[in-house]
């Protein structure tokens, strides 16, 4: 049983350094991890030697008498004393080693574009016929033709209203001002038709994924520190998640976290894999690094609902499953009729857990750009090692770390922003995507065909 990153650290540390460099991280962490792991192994071997010596001496004592016996007893005590000291050192080394191993990022897949940030992300395909305001045509071409894609689009001569103004001024179905007063920035109140739309989106995603055999899960909304350490890179993301004061608990930022922990510390027979789950949960995020980006509206908020795909897989199957997960997300957005592109995320923008990541970005007509709606990652054995989740091979009962993968299906508030911008009419009416209508029909007060603007009062 071997963790891929530890194997590379021991056998080809210089190669592992190259992977760390691709992420634009300091490669010296590899040297420190290599040195500490080597010292830990040598100390472990020395402890085994000391124990063997002590056992040999202890077996000799009953056979001896007088001075010889006293000498052996003294030798045994000395060995025990040394053993105690070395075991203390080993414990310290184990803690240091684990911290260093946990700080190592995943191995970057060979198909990932190398670059320090999202400006190096590479679009790989487009879908749909975007509506492009005449003032954004050059901007649109910069996001399509620059990468060698000729995307058909519809020119409109009226500029669409941004989702924030649509929500609060045109439809009057949201209030971020009052939410800001009572909870702070990046919170919101949503009302009536938008709430129904939120629920319909979640039902739409769940209906599709459960029909494909995914097991529906309502997970815990909080996790212990030990578990969070296994799921994410806590050193990087500790300021992005909420901690419950006075408790060893953190609010989840996505259902991925509790779904990854669902089989923590388990050995799973290979014939049971893949295990496919679809989780639904609220998500809580500090958005500490967002600064002043997307302060208006509900695109980047502290809480939202999300349907998440999560799979436990055999290593040899995981790359095919990654394509399945992004394909599922594409199916949902095609059903909604929202134009999008799939982007291969650059190495410096991956985040420590992912070996490779795709984003699905929806076209936002009022902004004149594509924005992230879905994130799909193959984490390979990065989480499995930290949470000790292994698969058992039938031949020889060999245990090895399995692979975990995750992908957004629908993040409701972000998808609502895309609907408000893509399906608005010049008069402010928003057409409801046809695929959502059957999920809205169960509510007597829900909109079925369209959401209409509030009529302006006459003076």
Swiss-Prot record:
It catalyses: tRNA(Ser) + L-serine + ATP = L-seryl-tRNA(Ser) + AMP + diphosphate + H(+); tRNA(Sec) + L-serine + ATP = L-seryl-tRNA(Sec) + AMP + diphosphate + H(+). Its main location: cytoplasm. L-serine binds at residues 254-256, 308, 408. It is found in: Cytoplasm. It is an enzyme of class 6 (ligase). CDD domains: SerRS_core. It holds the Pfam family tRNA-synt_2b. Transmembrane segments: none annotated. Coiled coil: none annotated. The keyword ATP-binding applies. Keywords: Aminoacyl-tRNA synthetase, ATP-binding, Cytoplasm, Ligase, Nucleotide-binding, Protein biosynthesis. ATP binds at residues 285-287, 301, 372-375. Pathway: Aminoacyl-tRNA biosynthesis; selenocysteinyl-tRNA(Sec) biosynthesis; L-seryl-tRNA(Sec) from L-serine and tRNA(Sec): step 1/1. GO terms for biological process: selenocysteine biosynthetic process; seryl-tRNA aminoacylation. SUPFAM superfamilies: Class II aaRS and biotin synthetases, tRNA-binding arm. One of its GO terms (molecular function) is ATP binding. Consists of two distinct domains, a catalytic core and a N-terminal extension that is involved in tRNA binding. Belongs to the class-II aminoacyl-tRNA synthetase family. Type-1 seryl-tRNA synthetase subfamily. Homodimer. The tRNA molecule binds across the dimer. PANTHER family: SERYL-TRNA SYNTHETASE (PTHR11778). Catalyzes the attachment of serine to tRNA(Ser). Is also able to aminoacylate tRNA(Sec) with serine, to form the misacylated tRNA L-seryl-tRNA(Sec), which will be further converted into selenocysteinyl-tRNA(Sec). This is Serine--tRNA ligase. The gene is serS.
């Amino acid at each position: 049983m071997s963790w891929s990153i530890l194997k590379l650290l021991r056998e080809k540390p210089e190669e592992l350094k190259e992977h760390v460099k691709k992420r634009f991280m300091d490669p010296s962490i590899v040297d420190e991890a290599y040195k500490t792991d080597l010292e830990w192994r040598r100390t472990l071997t020395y402890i085994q030697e000391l124990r063997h010596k002590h056992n040999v001496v202890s077996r000799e004592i009953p056979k001896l008498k007088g001075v010889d016996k006293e000498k052996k007893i003294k030798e045994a005590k000395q060995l025990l004393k040394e053993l105690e000291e070395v075991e203390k050192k080993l414990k310290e080394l184990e803690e240091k080693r684990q911290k260093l191993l946990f700080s190592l990022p995943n191995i970057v897949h060979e198909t990932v574009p190398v670059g320090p940030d999202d400006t190096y992300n590479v679009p790989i395909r487009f879908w749909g016929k975007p509506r492009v305001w005449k003032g954004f045509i050059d901007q649109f071409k910069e996001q399509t033709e620059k990468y060698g894609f000729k995307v058909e689009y519809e020119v409109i001569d009226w500029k669409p209203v941004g989702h924030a103004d649509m929500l609060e001024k045109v439809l009057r179905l949201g209030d971020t001002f009052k939410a800001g007063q009572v909870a702070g920035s990046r919170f919101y109140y949503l009302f009536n038709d938008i709430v129904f739309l939120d629920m319909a989106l979640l039902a739409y995603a769940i209906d599709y994924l459960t029909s494909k055999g995914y097991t529906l899960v309502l997970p815990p909304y909080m996790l212990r520190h030990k578990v969070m350490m296994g799921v994410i890179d806590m050193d990087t993301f500790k300021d992005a998640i909420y901690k419950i004061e006075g408790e060893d608990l953190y609010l989840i930022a996505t259902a991925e976290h509790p779904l990854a922990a669902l089989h923590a510390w388990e050995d799973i027979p290979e014939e049971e894999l893949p295990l496919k789950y679809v989780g639904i949960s609220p998500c809580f995020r500090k958005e500490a690094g967002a600064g002043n980006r997307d302060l208006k509206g509900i695109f980047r908020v502290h809480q939202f609902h999300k349907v998440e795909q999560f799979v436990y897989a055999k290593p040899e199957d995981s790359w095919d499953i990654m394509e399945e997960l992004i394909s599922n997300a594409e199916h949902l957005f095609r059903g909604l009729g929202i134009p999008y592109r799939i982007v291969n995320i650059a190495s410096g923008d991956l985040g420590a857990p992912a070996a490779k990541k795709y984003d699905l970005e929806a076209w936002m007509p009022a902004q004149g750009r594509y924005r992230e709606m879905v994130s799909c990652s193959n984490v390979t054995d990065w989480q499995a090692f930290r949470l000790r989740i292994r698969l058992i091979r039938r031949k020889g009962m060999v245990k090895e770390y399995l692979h975990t993968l995750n992908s957004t299906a629908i993040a409701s508030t972000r998808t609502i922003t895309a609907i408000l911008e893509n399906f608005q009419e010049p008069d402010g009416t928003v057409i409801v995507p046809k695929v959502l209508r059957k999920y809205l029909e169960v509510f007597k007060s829900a909109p079925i065909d369209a959401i209409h603007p509030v009529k302006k009062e006459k003076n």
